[in-house]
UniProtKB/Swiss-Prot annotation:
Subcellular location: Cytoplasm
Name of protein: Exodeoxyribonuclease 7 large subunit
Catalytic activity: Exonucleolytic cleavage in either 5'- to 3'- or 3'- to 5'-direction to yield nucleoside 5'-phosphates
Record-stated family: Belongs to the XseA family.
Gene Ontology annotations of biological process type: DNA catabolic process
Organism from which the protein derives: Streptococcus thermophilus (strain CNRZ 1066)
Keyword line: Cytoplasm, Exonuclease, Hydrolase, Nuclease
GO CC entries: cytoplasm; exodeoxyribonuclease VII complex
Complexes and interactors: Heterooligomer composed of large and small subunits.
Described function: Bidirectionally degrades single-stranded DNA into large acid-insoluble oligonucleotides, which are then degraded further into small acid-soluble oligonucleotides.
EC number: 3.1.11.6
InterPro entries: Exonuc_VII_L (IPR003753), Exonuc_VII_lsu_C (IPR020579), OB-fold_nuc-bd_dom (IPR025824)
């Protein structure tokens, strides 16, 4: 039995062989991605060709660095190591590097990101901002030592010497370049004295220009409050920054020309043209008014000015006559009214009217006294009747007159129908009460 190995022992032995074999420590493979479904961290899938399949794993840290998205059926070249997983006895490939077969990883990443951003609307024309015709200050995000800034300064100074250039020194390639570009775009947007931005660099390989293809740079240009002109690489180079920028310039010189669409000479010519047009307009207005004045001076009004107010004098005379007539008629009416009132006042006998009012007052006073007495007497009679009615309901008075009150359970009885033989009753009399028992009940109407 000692010649037999356990499964665990065999698996450990094979794992040791795999780990120590120099040919398996670094393996270069070409295969097709199969059974792939993207996961949030580590990636698990298969690599296959026409004759075999091997399981593959890319750890999360490595996957972040490969720079492109895996797709089902994609053919890739990978570098990795083979290892055995002891619990299942299976072997797999741990991938350390990967790139698409037949196309560069950066080119694939560029195309994948371009499609994604296009679908999200980053490159739509409706988001493009117009460039201002006149600028006072231009922000430039580029390397301080490159030819880009020199070309921009030279062109702007030639076209419009009064325009200021504000340089944001920026790393434009290598690690950290994309983040620095984003930070400087954000800084520029915080300033109130800038009219637009030029973002760019000179030519280079796709690796050199890659910072301008990073998604964070594209998003920063898209969100810029200031209009952005991109000038990245040579005329044949294209970056995602060119797609998202409001305008793209093939060279730094072209970018400076776009930023100053109207040169100083053009501006001065435009001003002179406007001055001349204004001068000609003033001359035409003066000439028109002079001709109009000459025509008016020959009119009847100016030759016979008294005719200008003849009509008003006639109207004034007419109104004066109407006013005099109205005042005369009004005076006569008021005079007649005053005479009528005087006659009425003269005809009144004041002493007689006072005597009549006194007699009427005395008569009303007597009527009031009589009415008050009658009301009091009537109320007294009604009160006495009500008092007698209340006294008639007093049981003590009823009993005092020789009557008795029969109670059953402390309630007075009014009919024998409420009594049965053998019941106990109470009879209330003037000087006491009796407790009796009913022997016989005979109904008799009174």
């Amino acid at each position: 039995m000692s010649d037999y190995l356990s499964v665990t022992s065999l698996t450990k032995y094979l794992k040791m062989k795999f780990d120590r074999d120099p040919y398996l420590e670094r393996v270069y493979l070409t295969g097709q991605v199969s059974n792939y479904r993207r996961r949030p961290s580590h990636q698990y899938f298969s690599l296959k060709d026409e004759g075999a399949v091997i399981q593959a794993t890319i750890w999360a840290g490595v996957f972040k660095k490969i720079g492109f998205d895996l797709e089902e059926g994609m053919k890739i070249n990978v570098v990795g190591r083979v290892q055995i997983y002891e619990p299942s006895g299976s072997y797999s490939l741990i991938i350390e590097k990967a790139e698409p077969d037949g196309i560069g990883a950066l080119a694939l990443q560029f195309e994948q990101l371009r499609k994604k951003l296009t679908a999200e609307g980053y490159f739509d024309d409706r988001h493009k901002q117009p460039l201002p015709n006149f600028v006072k200050k231009i922000g430039v995000i580029t390397s301080p030592s490159g030819a880009v800034i020199r070309d921009i300064i030279t062109t702007v100074s030639r076209r419009f010497p009064g325009v200021e250039i504000l340089l944001f020194p920026t790393k434009v390639q290598g690690d950290g370049a994309a983040q620095e570009i984003v930070e400087n775009i954000q800084k520029a947007n915080q300033r109130e004295d800038l009219d637009l931005l030029i973002v760019g660099r000179g030519g280079g390989s796709i690796e050199d220009l890659w910072a301008f293809n990073e998604e964070i740079v594209v998003q920063s240009i898209f969100e810029s409050r200031l209009p952005v002109i991109s000038s990245v690489g040579h005329e044949t180079d294209t970056t995602l920054a060119d797609f998202v920028a409001d305008r793209r310039a093939a060279t730094p010189t072209a970018a400076a020309e776009l930023a100053t669409p109207i040169s100083k000479a053009d501006t001065l010519a435009w001003i002179r043209e406007r001055q001349n047009r204004a001068y000609q307009a003033c001359l035409r207005r003066i000439q028109y008014n002079q001709e109009r004045l000459a025509k008016l001076s020959q009119s009847v009004v100016f030759r016979q000015p008294e005719r200008l107010y003849d009509g008003y004098l006639q109207k004034l005379d007419h109104l004066t006559t109407r006013l005099e007539t109205f005042m005369s008629q009004d005076f006569e009416r008021k005079q007649k009214s005053a005479e009528f009132l005087r006659q009425r006042l003269h005809g009144l006998n004041l002493s007689t009217r006072v005597k009549n009012y006194q007699d009427r007052r005395e008569s009303l006073q007597r009527l009031l006294v009589t009415t008050t007495k009658n009301t009091i007497n009537g109320n007294r009679v009604r009160l006495e009747k009500a008092q007698d009615a209340l006294l008639s309901l007093d049981t003590s008075r009823i009993v005092a007159r020789g009557y008795a009150i029969v109670n059953k359970n402390d309630k007075p009885l009014t009919t024998i129908k409420d009594i049965t033989e053998g019941e106990q009753l109470t009879i209330q009399m003037r000087d006491g009460q009796l407790e009796v028992e009913v022997k016989n009940v005979n109904e008799k109407n009174i």
